[in-house]
């Protein structure tokens, strides 16, 4: 009986001794997974993250543990989201997860360079619309167990990391979709350069989920 009473006293003491610590832990866990619905950038668990939306529909972005993020969208306008690095380099990217679009959406290693200003996509998967439709392939690059068609187009007076600008957009589009694997970005950058597609100083690079006038969900972990 004395042992039983002692155990009760110890449990009661523990329950009263640590409420603030438990609250701090709960608050910390909540902040790590706080949902975001307006455009912002920042750092989370050692990774750069970027979330941009034009405000259309319902889009909710959530930073998870380490390199994980998730995003859900319903009848969205246009958004881009993801985790990665800033500044980036010609690095090898590994990612895994789930990508479940209904309509037009992209899963890509996505980023920018400056001087010159360039927006680029290494497209791993997409929804109902292939963004290379209507474009002429400039060539191909074989990398990481797959073949990618290369495209270039110009964007005129469009949003960019330098405000509304005119800039080149480069694409490597994987011929067989996948969700998960390794992307050796240096192979794509070298192939683009060989075709005369010049890049500048690396800005940010993320594994991006992007949606346009669609619905869906995506949970991705980068490393």
Swiss-Prot record:
The top EC class is hydrolase
Q: What is its main location?
A: secreted
Pfam families named among the record's database cross-references: Glyco_hydro_11 (PF00457)
Sorted alphabetically, which InterPro entries does this protein's record hold?
ConA-like_dom_sf, GH11/12, GH11_AS_1, GH11_dom, Glyco_hydro_11
Q: Which residues form the active site?
A: 119, 210
Keyword Signal on this protein? yes
- Span of the signal peptide: 1-17
Q: Which reaction(s) does the protein catalyse, per the Swiss-Prot or TrEMBL entry?
A: Endohydrolysis of (1->4)-beta-D-xylosidic linkages in xylans
Entry-linked SUPFAM superfamilies:
Concanavalin A-like lectins/glucanases (SSF49899)
According to the entry, every stretch annotated as the GH11 domain falls at: 35-223
Lipid biosynthesis found in the keyword field: no
Coiled-coil regions listed in the entry: none
Which residue ranges are recorded for the region named Interaction with protein inhibitor XIP-I? 5-7, 18-23, 85-87, 123-130
Activity versus pH: the note is: Optimum pH is 5.0.
* One Gene Ontology biological process: xylan catabolic process
Q: How does it assemble?
A: Interacts directly with the wheat xylanase inhibiting protein I (XIP-I).
Task: Provide the protein name.
Answer: Endo-1,4-beta-xylanase C
